[in-house]
From Swiss-Prot:
Binds 2 Zn(2+) ions per subunit. Its cofactor is Zn(2+). Zn(2+) 2 binds at D152, H179, H232. This is Dihydroorotase. It catalyses: (S)-dihydroorotate + H2O = N-carbamoyl-L-aspartate + H(+). Zn(2+) 1 binds at H60, H62, D152, D305. It holds the Pfam family Amidohydro_1. It comes from the Bacteria. Substrate binds at H62, L63, R64, N94, H309, F323, G324. Pathway: Pyrimidine metabolism; UMP biosynthesis via de novo pathway; (S)-dihydroorotate from bicarbonate: step 3/3. Its EC number is 3.5.2.3. GO terms for cellular component: cytoplasm. InterPro entries: Amidohydro-rel, DHOase, DHOase/Allantoinase_Hydrolase, Dihydroorotase_CS, Metal-dep_hydrolase_composite, Metal_Hydrolase. The gene is pyrC.
């Protein structure tokens, strides 16, 4: 059925649109953006007082399927995405088996086609088993549907292997995404190395562990010409190096997470495992540098790094529990509160970070409301008041530091390929 999204403020950075208008979707695609559109057979969504944007893209999500379905599935993770205003998500390869072959990539594509509430795009591994030694079947994975390659939380430590991976990535025109961490510097660490790690008696992860890897990889990106992307950037020096590379013509991009611009290590509740993630929450100075990078345009995208873990694993001693938090349902609200409400960035810039920014890296053919584009739309309110109850999350996991937080601003409706998948009014996910 056609759908008309009526009377919202339409902001589409891809087409430089910012005006009150209607959005008309027919047969799963954008048919028009203009005032006073109507169709007697169309479903109507009243967006008066709301922002209507291209469907948001999260380029860094862990769906855990296959292999870890007790933590998340493609179905449950995609439902959490819909409830967070995301219409497209890219899933990392740290599954069991690792997504290092066309067989696993095809499995994810087929499961997503039949069960996902939103568009799901798989990311293939750089190396077999993400072991950092032998390159995975990159060409075969791309043919099966992979949109990028990454070993995710297992950085490619061997520079020779990384060089070869970049050469292959360039030949297949795929971005290569690196979790930047020198494991020799960070080994055994549980939180940011600084005054708080000393105070709490926890081993630290120095900012230098990220900086060293970014520096090495920028040299390799210059050597190979690969499209290189830094995942969840978290340090001042790393942001500066990415800016240096971009200013010298390197095809380098980076993303950051809502928790890295919304929290610092000073905000951590001592020994609360819901504040344990990697990269860790850094000092206030590093957090401020991340915000500066978002303002300046050095950072291309906001990505959640949604990393579900069941309570049986996460609620252990801080030193023993796994890294990571869920984030799909709180990302937009955090960005509105921490970035837009204080006047640090505009609504248009926020939407760029969730649409044209990740689209420029992943090249999914999404992230715009121009006629003919897929009918993916995110409707949100900058002011709606709501309280996040992690126990009501669509995710299978509950590991969030934002439980019981009252937000001002958040998603109102998620439309995927012309179908209403979630709305705040009904809270029903289809």
């Amino acid at each position: 059925m056609p759908i008309v999204i009526r009377n919202g403020r339409v902001i589409d950075p891809a087409s430089n649109t910012d005006r009150v208008a209607d959005v008309f979707i027919v047969d799963g695609r954008i048919a028009g953006v203009a005032p006073n559109l109507s169709s007697p057979k169309a479903e109507v969504f009243d967006a008066t007082g709301m922002i209507v944007a291209p469907g948001f893209i999260d380029m860094h999500v862990h769906l855990r399927e296959p292999g870890f379905e007790h933590a998340e599935t493609i179905e449950s993770g995609s439902r959490a995405a819909a409830a967070g205003g995301f219409t497209s998500i890219c899933c990392m390869p740290n599954t069991k088996p690792v997504n290092d072959s066309a067989m696993v990539t095809s499995y994810i594509v087929e499961q997503a086609r039949s069960k996902a509430a939103v568009n799901v795009f798989p990311i293939g591994a750089i190396t077999k088993g993400s072991a950092g030694e032998e390159l995975a079947a990159i060409g075969a994975m791309k043919a099966a549907g992979a949109v990028a390659i990454s070993d995710d939380g297992l950085p490619v430590m061997n520079a020779r292997v990384m060089r070869r991976a970049m050469e292959f990535a360039r030949s297949y025109d795929l971005p290569i995404i690196q979790h930047c961490e020198d494991l020799n510097l960070s080994a055994g660490g549980d939180m940011h190395e600084g005054a708080n790690s000393v105070r709490w008696g926890l081993r630290g992860i120095p900012a230098a562990s990220e900086d060293v890897m970014v520096a090495r990889d920028l040299v390799l990106a210059q050597l190979t010409g690969a499209r290189y992307h830094v995942a969840h950037i978290s340090t001042r020096n790393a942001v500066a190096m990415v800016e240096y590379g971009r200013s010298h013509g390197l095809p380098v991009t980076c993303e950051t997470t809502p928790h890295h611009f919304g929290l610092a290590d000073a905000d951590m509740a001592p020994y609360d495992s819901n504040y344990k993630m990697k990269p860790p929450l850094r000092s206030c100075g590093h957090r401020d540098a991340i915000i500066e990078g978002l303002i300046a345009g050095t950072i291309s995208a906001i990505a959640t790094d949604h990393a579900p873990h069941p309570g049986s694993e996460k609620m252990q001693e801080f030193e023993r529990c796994p890294f990571g938090i869920i984030g799909l349902e709180t990302a937009l609200a955090l960005a509105l509160e921490e970035l837009v409400a204080p006047g640090k960035i505009t609504l248009a810039r926020l939407i760029e970070l969730f649409t044209t920014g990740p689209e420029s890296v992943m090249r999914l053919g999404r992230g715009t409301l121009t006629p003919g584009a897929p009918g993916d739309v995110t409707v949100f309110s900058p002011t709606v008041e709501w309280t996040y109850d992690v126990n009501q999350s669509a995710s299978r996991s509950r590991n969030s530091p934002f439980h019981a937080r009252t937000f001002h601003g958040g998603p109102m409706a998620t439309i995927v390929n012309g179908g209403l998948k979630w709305s705040r009014q009904s809270s029903h996910i289809t």
